[in-house]
A protein has these predicted regions:
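Long, basic/Gly/Ser/Thr-rich N-terminal segments
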Residues: 1-87
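Switch II of P-loop NTPase G domains
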Residues: 54, 163-216, 223-231, 354
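Flexible phosphate/Mg2+-sensing switch loops adjacent to catalytic phosphate-binding sites
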Residues: 81-85, 114-153
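Hydrophobic anchor at the beta1->P-loop junction of P-loop NTPases
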Residues: 92-94
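Walker A (P-loop) phosphate-binding loop of P-loop NTPases
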Residues: 99
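Conserved lysine of the Walker
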Residues: 102
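A conserved segment at the C-terminal end of the G1
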Residues: 105-115
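Conserved GTP-binding G-domain of TRAFAC-class P-loop NTPases and closely related GTPase folds
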Residues: 207-384
Length: 384
């Protein structure tokens, strides 16, 4: 079975549909009501989809006879990339409380995977559809990297139904003693507003998204923890604004809500969960000199397990210090496999609406993903 990364339906390989290539001599475009219902808004005008008895790499349209290689999900009619169908990989979901910096994190993480981290891991990051390419360029890369503007807060899917996830395939070549194999991880990045997790209008799609995930990354804004705010210096405190009274900004509320959505039986959940404190740069001046969060990760093409454990314990201690130790205890009670992280997408406290004068200097943004690659046996772990 393949999980559609758009509607999250489980689809047997022999039920994958094809879409006519259209064009000269092909079928005329017509309204695709199924895709329209999935995306919301006006149904797009596209050549028709059709099913075949034994799907292969290509299929002939029964109406016009033209060959096509465009695969489509039978449930929502979204295009399924050939590479994704051949090697679908694990699905990683991203969830964050309101104001936790999800959009900025997505922009910087993808940029690092395409460049510095991708080169270190000998990994390729492939967008799975044209909408992903266009959305990343227009909504993430251009404003942040091209214009150095801060990204706007995520709109709730209730008011922004046309928002599709960004879908990428991260592929690594794993060289074993006997053979070489390609392993893939599917990053399905819904830039999910915190309130979406309690809205009846969209909860079904988000529920399928979360339950289809093989791992979840939670982004937590530590500046929403009163104990952490007390440690801010004057500049960081002035730029951070006040505490948000909205319950969707409370990290524990969001983690609890997701946990209850996922729970289908008693006992701890087995899905690996990475919980990352974003904007850690604002708090670094208050950390002890020997803190693991003062260290940058040393690039090695592997996961440094000693460093990983040191950062986890440091974040756990900080949560206790900030009177938020309940977060760590809740995770321990409800998940069999979880890890804590501290990161910063920008690397410094930004100006009111723009990146700081020092530019974008990401700090440990890749750490949660490296840990998940290690958990999925796609990355070696080393000590010493």
């Amino acid at each position: 079975l393949i999980t559609c990364p758009y509607c999250f339906a489980r689809v047997a390989e022999n039920r994958i549909m094809f879409r006519c290539s259209g064009g000269r001599g092909g079928c005329e475009a017509r309204a695709d009501e199924v895709l329209g219902r999935h995306r919301g808004g006006v149904p797009p005008s596209l050549p028709p989809v059709f099913s075949v008895r034994r799907p292969g790499r290509r299929a002939s349209c029964p109406e016009c006879g033209r060959e096509t290689s465009r695969r489509a999900c039978p449930q929502c009619h979204s295009r399924l990339a050939a590479e994704y169908c051949a090697n679908p990989g694990k699905i990683v979901a991203l969830v964050g409380a309101k104001g936790s910096g999800k959009s900025t994190y997505i922009a910087v993480l993808l940029h690092e995977l395409m460049n510095r981290v991708g080169a270190e891991l000998d990994a390729s990051l492939t967008p799975c559809d044209d909408r992903t390419i266009e959305r990343y360029r227009q909504e993430f890369a251009r404003p942040l990297y091209g214009e150095h503007r801060l990204l706007r807060a995520t709109q709730s899917a209730v008011t922004d139904r046309g928002r599709d996830p960004l879908v990428y395939l991260l592929t690594r070549t794993i060289r074993g003693r006997l053979r070489t194999r390609a392993e893939s991880l599917t990053l399905v990045l819904f830039d999910t507003a915190g309130e979406d997790l309690r809205s009846r209008d969209v909860s079904e799609l988000h529920l399928r998204y979360l339950r289809a995930a093989d791992a979840i990354v939670f982004l937590v804004d530590p500046l929403e923890l009163p104990g952490a705010r007390a440690a801010l210096n004057g500049t960081a405190l002035a730029r951070s604004g006040g505490l948000d009274d909205d319950p969707d900004s409370d990290p524990l509320n969001v983690i609890t809500r997701v946990t209850e959505l996922l729970r289908q039986s008693r006992g701890p959940l087995t899905v690996p969960v990475a919980v990352a404190l974003s904007k850690i740069d604002a708090l670094r001046p208050s950390l002890a000199r020997q803190s693991a969060l003062h260290r940058a990760r040393v690039p090695s093409g592997a996961l440094d397990l000693d460093d990983r454990e040191a950062v986890h314990e440091q974040v756990l201690a900080l949560l206790e210090e900030w009177q938020a130790g309940v977060v760590g205890r809740y995770l321990r009670q409800n998940y069999t496999d979880h890890a804590l992280f501290g990161l910063s997408a920008l690397g410094a406290v930004p100006e009111v609406e723009s990146v700081g004068a020092g530019g974008i200097r990401p700090y440990r943004v890749e750490d949660p993903l490296l840990w998940l690659l290690y958990r999925f046996k796609m990355l070696d772990g080393v000590r010493g």
